[in-house]
């Protein structure tokens, strides 16, 4: 039996204990001993998409059927551009059609979009039903499946409508990454690099040394990167579940990145690609504020380049960037706040910056026409 590594997300504050486990390993889709304790009845809804369903849906359903768990599938279109109200209503339609009750768990089988949609549906259907994450993309495994952020996009901004709603379990089968396209693998690595930048300089060093192994999908390297990323996120979420302070660090590069996604149209840039370019913008801004050195910016740029990720944003007008960033969830009293680096391995939350410096960064960090 393959080894399993487990991480606890500690959320044991009153009035209820909402702590849960993240299990990481190869072949976990077949490990019903991990999943069944979180299925209170003999019925479950599996939410997935048209890409993942042919690969893993029947494997999961068959394993559950062997234990007399009745399932039905809700198969949604694939892509960030479908993360909206109309798709969410498809989930509600199916839940109502199948007479799902408050004890009927929703299982998210897919990437970040499926996890966000399923989690938001679980948070709101009958005012809350059980929710389990089975992430199948690297980005979802290291980031979006952990921490309880759920929601949908609005034409004016990304993730503007949603809820904090924690899963009961995260089951991460790293074997699903064998079918992940290279572009999506690289996008997930962008979020892994983020963890080293904001919280763990040694992890950043490790990534510099082992990036080729990650890109080659070496199982030991992949499992370590997933585990360390989840450890960092679990620690941060346990200390600040609702992003009142420390958790904001996880948004390094996201203020710029969300502006890129919104301006270019959801799906044109993968989330991790936008975060990569946005992180270089945040690093450039940090250097202009004399928080980090040019040498540190060069190290960051080289690691993203070595991963095959964009290090410059698309050529959008500064006005368009600023307009999109004004809708960022960290805006306070009309002022855009940025997560900035103090060094590799340390970041600071919620800083405003002088507009002239911001414009300099936007000018320097976009691709040539």
Swiss-Prot record:
CDD domains: DHQS. GO terms for cellular component: cytoplasm. It comes from the Bacteria. It catalyses: 7-phospho-2-dehydro-3-deoxy-D-arabino-heptonate = 3-dehydroquinate + phosphate. This is 3-dehydroquinate synthase. One of its GO terms (molecular function) is nucleotide binding. Binds 1 divalent metal cation per subunit. Can use either Co(2+) or Zn(2+). InterPro entries: Dehydroquinate_synthase (IPR050071), DHQ_synth_AroB (IPR016037), DHQ_synth_fam (IPR030963), DHQS/DOIS_N (IPR030960), DHQS_C (IPR056179). Its cofactor is NAD(+); Co(2+); Zn(2+).
């Amino acid at each position: 039996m393959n080894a399993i590594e487990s991480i606890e997300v500690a959320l044991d504050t009153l009035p209820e204990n909402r702590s849960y486990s993240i299990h990481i390993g190869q072949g976990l889709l077949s490990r019903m001993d991990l999943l069944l304790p979180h299925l209170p009845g003999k019925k479950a809804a599996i939410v997935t998409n048209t890409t993942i369903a042919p690969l893993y849906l029947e494997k999961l359903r068959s394993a559950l059927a062997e234990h007399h768990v009745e399932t039905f599938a809700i198969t949604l279109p694939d892509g960030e551009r479908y993360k909206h109200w109309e798709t969410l209503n498809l989930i509600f339609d199916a839940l109502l059609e199948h007479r799902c009750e408050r004890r009927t768990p929703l299982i998210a089988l897919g990437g970040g979009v499926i996890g966000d949609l399923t989690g938001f549906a679980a948070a709101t259907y009958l005012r809350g039903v059980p929710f389990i994450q089975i992430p199948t993309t690297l980005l979802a495994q290291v980031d979006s499946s952990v921490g309880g952020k759920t929601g949908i996009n609005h034409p004016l901004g990304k993730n503007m409508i949603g809820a904090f709603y924690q899963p009961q379990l995260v089951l991460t089968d790293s074997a699903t990454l064998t079918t992940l396209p290279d572009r999506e693998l690289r996008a997930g690595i962008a979020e892994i690099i983020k963890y080293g930048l904001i919280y763990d300089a040694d992890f950043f060093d490790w990534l510099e040394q082992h990036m080729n192994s990650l890109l080659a999908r070496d199982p030991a390297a992949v499992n370590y990167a997933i585990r360390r990323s989840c450890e960092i996120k679990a620690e941060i979420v346990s200390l600040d579940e609702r992003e009142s302070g420390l958790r904001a660090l996880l948004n390094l590069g996201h203020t710029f990145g969300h502006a890129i996604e919104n301006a270019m149209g959801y799906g044109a840039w993968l989330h991790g690609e936008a975060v990569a370019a946005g992180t270089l913008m945040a690093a450039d801004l940090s250097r202009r504020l004399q928080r980090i050195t040019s040498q540190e910016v060069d190290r960051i740029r080289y690691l993203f380049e070595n991963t095959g990720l964009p290090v410059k944003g698309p050529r959008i007008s500064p006005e368009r960037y600023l307009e999109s960033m004004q809708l960022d969830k960290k805006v306070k009293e009309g002022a855009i706040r940025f997560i900035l680096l103090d060094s590799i391995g340390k970041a600071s939350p919620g800083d405003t910056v002088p507009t002239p410096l911001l414009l300099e960064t936007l000018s320097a960090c976009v691709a040539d026409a």
